[in-house]
């Protein structure tokens, strides 16, 4: 959950940078989108049609205000802001390997942001609310229900030539409920700070306009102490200590952005290929059983954070 909160925020904001550069000649830089991520090959084939329908209806229902970030005189529009929003829904199953029980994950989020151009530099603020439901298929009906409220500050700095340095810092408040058969057995709160930076070289490589990039991301999360009351059937009460841990990754890849001309129409093709190396270590945490006061150490694998 901790890493997913960081990923959802940074991924959405960095896509905003890409969108701004693809549309920098437009006078209207407002944007409102809905994104679906489905880890199911059958359902994934239907998502594009649904996304287009939702985005079309959303666009038609909104009355845009002109707020240009592209002008010959950058000081003229120094007070103008472009506003944007992004909704995302993700669901799928992960972690099914050998004797490891799979997890069904459903993530929903909405982000609202505003940005403007100051002396050819982009500055913006964005707020995201996210809800993560994680169901563990272990026969007990275990589930985690997490709420995340995140404030982001982001910016883009043009470097020499056609290179850009995009960065963001964010702070989150987390609320996590542990449930067994829809009964809350534990409540935990957390806070989180994180930063992400990406370097892009926009010199054109090949006719598909390939753009190499490198990214570094780091976060610190602190979870409060909490008591797991279990159920009447388990008759077990465990007190978990406060937990502070770091997460991070380094990645690199290629983006492509190409326009295909078809008679009187144009088709914009863009995407990216990325390799991510996870720097997060396994985390040890301790808890005590209320009845015998025995301290137990448990290791959380990095892919579970």
Specify the residue positions occupied by each region the protein language model found.
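Membrane translocator/pore-forming domains, dominated by Gram-negative outer-membrane beta-barrels
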Residues: 1-24, 32, 77-305
């Amino acid at each position: 959950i901790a890493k997913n909160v960081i990923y959802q925020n940074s991924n959405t904001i960095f896509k905003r940078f890409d969108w701004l550069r693809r549309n920098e000649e437009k006078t209207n830089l407002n944007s409102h989108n809905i994104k679906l991520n489905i880890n199911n090959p059958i359902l994934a084939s239907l998502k594009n049609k649904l996304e287009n329908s939702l985005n079309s209806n959303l666009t038609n229902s909104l009355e845009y205000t002109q707020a240009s970030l592209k002008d010959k005189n950058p000081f003229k529009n120094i007070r103008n802001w472009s506003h944007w929003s992004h909704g995302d829904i993700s669901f799928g199953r992960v972690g099914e390997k050998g004797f490891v029980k799979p997890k069904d994950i459903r993530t929903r989020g909405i982000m609202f942001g505003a940005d403007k151009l100051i002396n050819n530099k982009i500055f913006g603020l964005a707020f995201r609310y996210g809800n993560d439901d994680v169901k563990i298929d272990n026969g007990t009906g275990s589930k985690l229900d997490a709420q995340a409220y995140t404030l982001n500050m982001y910016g883009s700095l043009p470097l020499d030539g056609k290179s850009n340095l995009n960065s963001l810092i964010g702070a989150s408040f987390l609320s996590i409920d542990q449930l067994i058969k829809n009964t809350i057995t534990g409540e935990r709160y957390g806070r989180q700070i994180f930063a992400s930076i990406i370097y892009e070289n926009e010199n054109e490589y090949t006719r598909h306009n390939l753009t190499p990039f490198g990214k570094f991301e780091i976060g610190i999360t602190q979870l409060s102490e909490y008591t797991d009351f279990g159920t009447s059937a388990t008759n077990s009460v465990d007190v978990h200590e406060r937990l502070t841990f770091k997460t991070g990754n380094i990645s690199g890849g290629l983006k492509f952005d190409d326009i295909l001309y078809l008679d009187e129409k144009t088709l914009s093709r863009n995407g990216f290929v990325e390799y991510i190396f996870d720097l997060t270590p396994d985390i040890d945490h301790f808890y005590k059983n209320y009845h015998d006061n025995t301290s137990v150490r448990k290791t959380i694998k990095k892919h579970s954070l």
